[in-house]
Amino acid sequence: MANGCYAPHGIGGDLMEPRYAVLQKVRNGKRTYGVTPHIPGGFISSKQLIKIAEVAEKYSGILKMTSGQRIAILGLDAEDVPKVWEELGMEPGVKSLNSVKNVHMCPAAFCKRAKQNSLKIGMALDKRYHGMEMPCRTKIGVAGCRNACTSVYARDLGVIGDKEGYMVTAGGSGGFTPRVADIIIDKLTEEQVFLVVDTLMEYYKANGNMGEKLGDFIQRIGLDKFKEDILSKSIY
């Protein structure tokens, strides 16, 4: 389970809310919650899938496939949330508001269109960054070809495979004020991808203002400066 360095109770840090749960509705004074276990890249074993279904049925929850490649259990009573997490035995999908929420991944090696088996990179980024505290909520997208079926250009950070290597993008958003990501560099090797991404994340974490999306940060300091600082500290 997640450690205690994140939001102590509700995802927003509200002491009155159950830990790692999102308030859904208040109807006639009754509050219901949703929980979302972490499923890296949307890949799940049959045993995990059965466990989620069994726990949801036991606590009268409703299952919902999410846009983040996860399965949410909705309609839970507050007192049942801790029991649900204990019985699932899985990491929370979202650990705090301003953190890396997920790493979207395409099927890659399972897709005939893939130019690179980007799953290795996606799983490594998930292991390295999921739940890490950032200036603002952060989403990562990884795709094995330029079709970018994980909406990479709408993610804060993206990695796209191509015949000539990998491309890294940054600053995308599909939220209230959509923004298309900027291409930071292309034709990277797998090793170079990690150098660039690690440098980019550290740079944003150190210099971004609290609550400032990566795209807004890039606009504030300028794309040219952002690219120069990232690339000079990573591969140039």
Sequence positions of predicted segments:
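Flexible, glycine/charged-enriched surface loops at secondary-structure junctions
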Residues: 5-8, 61-67, 134-137, 206-220, ...
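Mobile "lid/hinge" segments at catalytic clefts and subdomain interfaces of large enzymes
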Residues: 2, 144, 153-213, 227
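Small-residue-enriched alpha-helical segments and adjacent helix-cap loops
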Residues: 8-9, 35-162
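Short, flexible, solvent-exposed loop/turn segments with mixed acidic/basic and small polar residues
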Residues: 23-29, 59-65, 173-174
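A glycine-rich phosphate-binding loop feature that marks nucleotide/adenosyl-phosphate handling sites
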Residues: 142-147, 216-224
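Charge-rich, low-complexity segments
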Residues: 2-16, 221-228, 236
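Conserved active-site/ligand-binding neighborhood in enzyme cores
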Residues: 11, 16, 38, 43-44, ...
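Intrinsically disordered, low-complexity polar/charged tails and linkers
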Residues: 5-33
